[in-house]
UniProtKB/Swiss-Prot annotation:
A Gene Ontology biological process term: cell-cell adhesion
Source species: Gallus gallus (Chicken)
Function: Integrin alpha-6/beta-1 (ITGA6:ITGB1) is a receptor for laminin on platelets. Integrin alpha-6/beta-1 (ITGA6:ITGB1) is present in oocytes and is involved in sperm-egg fusion. Integrin alpha-6/beta-4 (ITGA6:ITGB4) is a receptor for laminin in epithelial cells and it plays a critical structural role in the hemidesmosome.
Designated name of the protein: Integrin alpha-6
Positions contributing to Ca(2+) 3 binding: 438, 440, 442, 444, 446
Localization per record: Cell membrane
Glycosylated sites: 71, 217, 278, 364, 515, 609, 730, 747, 780, 957
Amino-acid positions noted as binding Ca(2+) 1 in the UniProt annotation, renumbered to this chain: 318, 320, 322, 326
Amino acid sequence: MAAALLLYLPLLPGLAGAFNLDAENVIGRRGEPGSLFGFSLAMHRQLQPQEKRLLLVGAPREKAFPSQQANRTGGLYSCDITSSDTRCTRVVFDEDTDPKMESKEDQWMGVTVQSQGPGGNVVTCAHRYEKRQYVNTVQETRDIIGRCYVLSQDLTIKDDMDNGVWSFCDGRLRGHEKFGSCQQGVAATFTRDYHYIVFGAPGTYNWKGVVRAEQKNQTFYDLGIFDDGPYEVGDESRQDKNLVPVPANSYLGFSLDSGKGIVSQDEMTFVSGAPRANHSGAVVLLKKEKNQRALSLEHMFEGEGLASSFGYDVAVVDLNSDGWQDIVVGAPQYFDRSGDIGGAVYIYINQRGKWEGIKPIRLNGTADSMFGLAVENVGDINQDGYPDIAVGAPYDGFGKVYIYHGSKNGINTEPAQILDGEKTGTNFFGYSIAGNMDLDKNSYPDIAVGSLSDSVSVFRSRPVISITKSITVQPDKLDLKKKNPEDPSEIWMDVKACFQYTANPRNLNPRIKINYTFEAENERRQLGLPSRVRFKDYLSDQFTASTTLIGQNSKRCVTAKLVLQEKIKDKLRPIPIAVSVNIAGLESGSSSTRKERALPDLIPILNSNESETKITKVEFLKEGCGEDNECHSNLKLQYRFCTREGNEDRFTYLPIENGIPVLVLKDQKDIALEITVTNNPSDARNPQKDGEDAYEAKLIATFPDSLTYSAFREMRGYPEKQLTCGANQNGSQAECELGNPFKRNSNVTFYLILSTTKVNVDTTDLDINLKLETTSTQVNSTAITASAKVVLELLLSLTGVAKPSQVYFGGNIVGESAMKSEDNIGNLIEYEFRVTNLGRPLKTFGTASLDIQWPKEISNGKWLLYLMKIESKGLEKVSCQPQNEINVLHVAESHNSRRKREIAEKQLTDSKTFSLFSERKYKTLDCKVNAQCVDIRCPLKGFDSKASILLRSRLWNSTFLEEFSKMNYLDILVRASISVPAAAKNVKLTNEAAQVRVTVFPAKPVALYTGVPWWIIAVAIFAGVLMLALLVFLLWKCGFFKRSKKDHYDATYHKAEIHAQPSDKERLTSDA
């Protein structure tokens, strides 16, 4: 079949809201337990011998009459709901039994019941009625042929030929292949023209099923018309199963309805469901064949879901009132793979008798609800001109009945009302439904709902009325300069509202008490804004009172005084005044359509298609605006970013790069945004075009997460300063009121001071949304974005120190495997790097890191500095990476490092006494030249102003003995720097790298002094003394020690002094 339009009920909000079926004053009737009282229902109007409006209830498991020679046979009950007697009366018929010919045990009388209409007949059936032959013999046979009874309008069997038993399968060929299991009466109905009675027999022809229509109108006989039927699927004369348009086990005739205007406006069409046809179900449209006694196929609708029982129930109803009957089909066992759908109803909207290619509307029920087990034309229950339908879902909780209203488009797919069995305490509520008749005589059709719990509920329809509302205000325009002459301190308005109602039918004229509510400024109140007016007698902007409407089209008017509040801001937008109504009840003594009523009148309900509220608006006479009383403003905005010097109100514009302001943020706490707003005419040659007063003019500034509002400074304003600014709780938005009104040719310049404390390393831009708003007409009110680029300048310093700065090596060479304690490695060296922040707290920029180039090995891979441990001061617990470079050999820590360092320093001091005579050899060990280094990164978590990283290390003694024993000393360089993640984008880092130098000396000059014999020293001393003696002797021989005359002495002295240069002593000293 064609794909269906879907509607899933649980997705619709507010479906439980009631419309005009009264769910509070439900009329209930109960039957005998276990009787299935309420299995079938029909409303019947008796005209003779007296008028009665009855509810007929089938109870197919009711106990038998004594004369029926059975336990349970089923029965039919008549209920007068207008009576104070809550008991229903059992209809007496089918009392006798011939046990030799039949069995009525469990025949299920009352399985179906239908009324022909006002003054018409009633049909009820027992589809399990058994026809017997050869009782108490071995040839005994039992055929479940079923049969029906037709009763006259007063529920009795007349002697007329059309009353009594109707059993067309009786006397035909037996066996399930023919008519032996035809089960006539599973469904039965009358055509609406009173001409035919229609029976369904789904067990005929191996449960193919047949539909039979027989003439049922006394008028035909009076007119001499005797040859109108009967008509039957398979042909009543030929009884040919091959003419049945569905396969075996289809159950054709399981549900029935009929009507004209289905295929043709003049011809009757019979509609029947076959819920097991082709394993999914089908609905067939049947027509009478001329000159034959056959019903033949006109069209077939096929179910779309396997085992969905499509056609379990059908209803013919003109939903859109276009004169063509539409078709409603129930498929209570439809489901989908998701498991969310439990039953469906298909709505086929008639296209002027054309059914090919029609796409049905599918209404879906909730899971396991059996939605669509019963579908019923319940008439126009709200009297809107479109018939309505009811859908039963007996397994939806306690059971529910969904009411859908017809409309000009076919059907409103949202239920107008849901009746719930839980409220009546009824299980399996909605198994059967009857309607389309007014039981309580208020001109609105009512609904009866049956169940499998031996109970029936009747829901009466409340009259639907439409109340016309009008509201006027004097004066209709407010002049703020014109005060009330009675009280010059106030401005008054007179409000008048009038009401009248209409209803269907036109003769329905109850006296209705209504509650009316005057309400002003509802939208402002919902926004949390104060109202600009109040009602004088109630000191509030709303009040409720009551009045009475005495009948249809009778007008009733009420008045109230409205007072304008003082010092209002909004002087441009109109003041809305609304009046709404609801029905409070009926006044005592209210007349109805009938003078005497056994049931109390129901309170009418307002038409749901009409608004309960009527609104009018009062305009202001506006100053500074054009002759059209409309204000056309021309607000313009300019902005510039500034820095603020300290806490003083001195502002400096930011530098511009590529057209974008650049904010270099060091230690500033605030920045400022200079804003200028003007309201000048856009065209000086046509100043009346715009630039008029801007009422409630304001600027709304929305800041990014990195900025918060701090304050504002108004620098200048023309013609007067009237600026006020305020912010929301977290400072993310500021609102500045420019003036009310911000007059023509006004301008204002002010600064928004913004805190930068939330600016962090991820902040690359500042985008501030600026929007001008006014209640005047502003042609261009688009928001603009003020943008600036952010550069963060970090003022960080880094210093480093090593303790001690000079160490020694010496002793014996020890292998790596022998290192058990750090003392075995070598002397202790502790490095400390101090980081100081001179600018903004670093926490706002994220996490900085200290990067250290650690000289781990010399160029040939031998150990240089062994890193034992890393600690911190002024930080959270430090975790440097890579962790596997710390104490790689897992040697034990030593706690005597201080003493060993002091001994080392003393030995180093002693060893320096020999350096005078050493050859001065030295070397620098540097990561950039001859050392293999590891990059160690230490995050400075929690760092704010000061922090220190301490590295505890050991000089690898054996490496220095092996590689550097001939060196007088060596320098080891360790470098460190600071980095910040994402610094390349917007962070300017001004720190300098730190370099720490440690000098290493050998413990003693091993290669210079080891192995010198003692005798060499003695010979050297003797040679020195001998040479000194020889020198003295030579001087004596030369007369050096004699006294001479002065002139000779002077010459001799000079000569001797010349010969003594250079002296032996000086030469020896030089050689040494």
